[in-house]
């Protein structure tokens, strides 16, 4: 059994390993960072395979060092304890009254199952998470997506399902056409 807990830390209410039941019965796990005061807030949701609990500094130390060296403003104003690969820093968004939700995709991190990147099942799971986030008592029903690369590509795919509560997407470096964007730039096979 995976333990869930809630705590107030660094000016946020943090809910760890919250279960989200999928339409096929599998339970995915999410970490939720939200304002301390009760209320209904817009949600920034990410869904992906890179372990929601793995800090940027530990998982990708050379990338972290390069980022803070070249872009010190990214780390400024944050303890950086909750920085995670290619997603928003909740310490920068929660003070402006957003809820940040990070979901480990099926078979990754604390979520059971088998990894099947960019599959119809993964896209449906992502849509289920959006619908879940839009109906929570801390949500105002507006769910936005944000993320780089994998987290951007899966945004294009889930948007095709038109989840009811999806209201915004911020795609960074997310290919929407594998042929043109990834494998055949200008029609020529990229190696």
Question: Where are the predicted features?
Answer:
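A catalytic-pocket lid/entrance helix-loop region that shapes and gates access to the active site
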Residues: 58, 64-69, 121, 146, ...
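Alpha/beta-hydrolase active-site loop
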Residues: 84-86, 95, 117-137
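Conserved alpha/beta-hydrolase
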Residues: 74, 90-110
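Alpha/beta-hydrolase active-site loop signature
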Residues: 51, 105-109, 175-176
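Short beta-strand element of the alpha/beta-hydrolase
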Residues: 40-49, 144
């Amino acid at each position: 059994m995976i333990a869930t807990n809630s705590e107030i830390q660094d000016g946020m209410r943090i809910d760890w390993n919250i279960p989200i039941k999928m339409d096929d019965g599998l339970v995915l796990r999410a970490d939720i960072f939200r304002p301390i005061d009760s209320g209904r807030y817009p949600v920034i949701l990410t869904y992906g395979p890179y372990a929601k609990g793995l800090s940027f500094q530990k998982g990708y130390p050379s990338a972290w060092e390069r980022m803070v060296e070249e872009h010190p403003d990214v780390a400024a104003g944050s303890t950086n304890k909750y920085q995670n690969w290619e997603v928003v820093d909740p310490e920068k968004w929660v003070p402006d009254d957003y809820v940040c939700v990070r979901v480990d995709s099926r078979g990754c991190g604390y979520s059971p199952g088998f990894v099947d990147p960019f599959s119809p099942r993964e896209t449906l799971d992502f849509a289920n998470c959006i619908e879940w986030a839009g109906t929570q008592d801390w949500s105002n029903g507006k769910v936005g997506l944000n993320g780089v690369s994998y987290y951007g590509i899966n945004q294009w795919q889930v948007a095709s399902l038109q989840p009811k509560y999806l209201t915004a997407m911020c795609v960074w470096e997310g290919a929407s056409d594998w042929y043109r964007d990834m494998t055949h730039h200008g029609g020529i096979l990229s190696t």
